[in-house]
Amino acid sequence: MAAVLGLCGGLGKRKFTRFPTAFVCLTNSGTRAVLWRSCSQCKQVTSSEDLPIPMENPYKEPLKKCILCEKRVDYKNVQLLSQFISPFTGCIYGRHITGLCGKKQREITKAIKRAQILGFMPVTYKDPAYLKDPKVCNIRYRE
């Protein structure tokens, strides 16, 4: 239903029989009055009541944080480092998969290479003892 705007000189009861249920009357002081057909009283609405309430965007997604920014990466922590290696090929996952920041991704890569050179980690596959570890990255493998 479209509302019809009726301009009134003052606030008075007017009978509108063939129009929609609400009319807006402008008074001399600048306030708006809403006239309802069903009720004989006029409700005055100030212009500040109709303004939207400022609030945060409810659809905004929270910012992604690097999960290792507060942690220290060590080449001897093989269980942590094995989470960032593919169990089938032994390749190191990239930033788009791990979700790490650039600084921590470089540290992880250097620590993995150092652990592989020093013999703490295998080069080609993930150690079977760590296959059932909780997943750090949200990666799904084909079964």
From Swiss-Prot:
Q: Name one GO molecular function term.
A: small ribosomal subunit rRNA binding
Q: Which UniProt keywords apply?
A: Mitochondrion, Ribonucleoprotein, Ribosomal protein, Transit peptide
Q: Which GO terms describe its biological process?
A: translation
Domain of life here?
Answer: Eukaryota
Offer a single GO CC term for the protein. mitochondrial small ribosomal subunit
Which InterPro entries does this chain map to?
Ribosomal_bS18, Ribosomal_bS18_CS, Ribosomal_bS18_sf
- Major localization listed first in the record, in broad terms: mitochondrion
Subcellular localization is given as: Mitochondrion
Extract the SUPFAM superfamilies matched here.
Ribosomal protein S18
Subunit relationships: Component of the mitochondrial ribosome small subunit (28S) which comprises a 12S rRNA and about 30 distinct proteins.
Q: Which family does it belong to?
A: Belongs to the bacterial ribosomal protein bS18 family.
| PANTHER family assigned | 30S RIBOSOMAL PROTEIN S18, SMALL RIBOSOMAL SUBUNIT PROTEIN BS18M
- Name of the protein: Small ribosomal subunit protein bS18m
